């Protein structure tokens, strides 16, 4: 009992203390480079800022589209409007302390349309895995453009960077095969002392969903590049694929940190570090871009989520109340649709900032 209490206290200290440390390090860096920052003349192009904002909003909409596609491949067919409203409105409760309510809300809400909990849970598991994999695939592809710029390009010659990118893509495609993926997933669950899960989907389905996520990352990465152009009109066109890869990998790094909400601090640090390796920017610009991208993407998310929440707010509140007495984690529930095998649900689900069921 005491060990569990210490564990919770330690986790809370990390969740609060680590962002404070990151913020302190950032402020110290700004202080040390303040003269160089003020010497640089930043150009704010409002039209490009607006275009970048629109791109981040498109990415938010793509989430619901991809989730609808995943549900359809699991045998649960819902209308696009319903999927968008459920996905985006359930994200609203992600800002409630605990950082798990959006998972529970989506599972319970979609159940009102006849989708069983195992299928809902499986769809979210596939969504998470393919989204992370797509981010790494996009970054691996962007490595093919790193040889012309930055520290990596000066340390490694062109063929080595190309080989690294190609090998990473091949390895990810192998890992996404259902046999390999299920084996690795259950290995991790056993190490965490959780129940196993069987994802009964075809390899072609996983690849198509991953491809859809790659398209989503392309949209977000283009918005990120336009954001860079808004402040630095001299950004070369070859920086476009580099920006797409950096933004995708930075999101992955922020997600798997599991400490701060939405990878706060980790994503920004990753963007600054990757820019230092891949693309020489004016002093301080990488930090400004990292913070500005967080701000613009968050505003885009809040607007999309608020619209969806207002269109189904009563349902969200009633489901949130019901989720306090209905937790995912019931084993051996049958998953209907397209011959899917029984799905065992693990006790916890990885989410940004923690896990469900801890």
Annotate each PLM feature.
Residues 1-88, 144-255, 278-358:
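Predominantly cytoplasmic-facing regulatory/coupling regions of multi-pass membrane proteins
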Residues 80-85, 99, 104, 113-128, ...:
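Membrane-interface alpha-helices at helix entry/exit sites of multi-pass transporters
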Residues 89-96, 248-268:
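Transmembrane alpha-helix interface/packing and boundary motifs in multi-pass membrane proteins
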Residues 101-113, 259-277:
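Re-entrant/interfacial helical elements at transmembrane boundaries that shape
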Residues 92-97, 111, 121-140, 253, ...:
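Membrane-embedded alpha-helical segments of transport systems
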Residues 3-4, 106, 110, 117-119, ...:
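Membrane-helix boundary/interface segments in integral membrane proteins
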């Amino acid at each position: 009992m005491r060990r569990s209490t210490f564990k919770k206290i330690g986790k809370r200290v990390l969740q609060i203390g680590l962002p404070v440390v990151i913020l302190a390090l950032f402020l110290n860096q700004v202080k040390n480079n303040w003269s160089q920052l003020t010497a640089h003349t930043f150009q704010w192009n409002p039209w490009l800022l607006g275009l970048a904002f629109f791109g981040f909003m498109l990415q938010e909409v793509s989430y619901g589209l991809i989730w609808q596609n995943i549900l359809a491949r699991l045998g649960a067919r819902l209308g696009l409007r319903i999927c968008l409203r459920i996905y985006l409105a359930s994200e609203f409760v992600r800002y409630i302390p605990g950082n798990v309510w959006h998972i529970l809300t989506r599972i319970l809400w979609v159940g009102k349309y006849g989708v069983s909990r195992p299928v809902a849970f499986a769809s979210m598991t596939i969504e998470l895995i393919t989204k992370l994999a797509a981010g790494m695939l996009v970054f691996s592809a962007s490595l093919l453009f790193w040889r012309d710029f930055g520290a990596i390009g000066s340390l490694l010659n062109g063929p080595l960077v190309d080989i690294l990118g190609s090998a990473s893509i091949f390895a990810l495609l192998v890992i996404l095969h259902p046999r390999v993926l299920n084996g690795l997933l259950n290995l991790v669950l056993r190490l965490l002392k959780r129940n196993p899960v069987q994802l009964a989907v075809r390899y072609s389905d996983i690849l198509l969903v991953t491809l859809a996520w790659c398209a989503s990352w392309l949209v977000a990465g283009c918005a990120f590049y336009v954001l860079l152009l808004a402040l630095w009109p001299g950004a070369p066109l070859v920086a476009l694929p580099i920006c797409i890869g950096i933004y995708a990998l930075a999101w992955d790094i922020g997600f798997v940190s599991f400490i701060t909400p939405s990878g706060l601090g980790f994503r920004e640090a990753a963007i600054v570090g990757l820019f230092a390796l891949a693309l020489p920017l004016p002093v301080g610009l990488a930090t400004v871009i990292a913070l500005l991208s967080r701000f613009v993407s968050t505003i885009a998310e809040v607007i999309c989520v608020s619209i969806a929440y207002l269109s189904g707010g009563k349902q969200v509140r009633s489901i949130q109340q019901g989720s306090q007495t209905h937790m995912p984690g019931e084993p051996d529930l049958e998953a209907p649709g397209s011959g899917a095998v029984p799905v065992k649900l693990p006790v916890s689900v990885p989410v940004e900032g923690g896990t469900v069921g801890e």
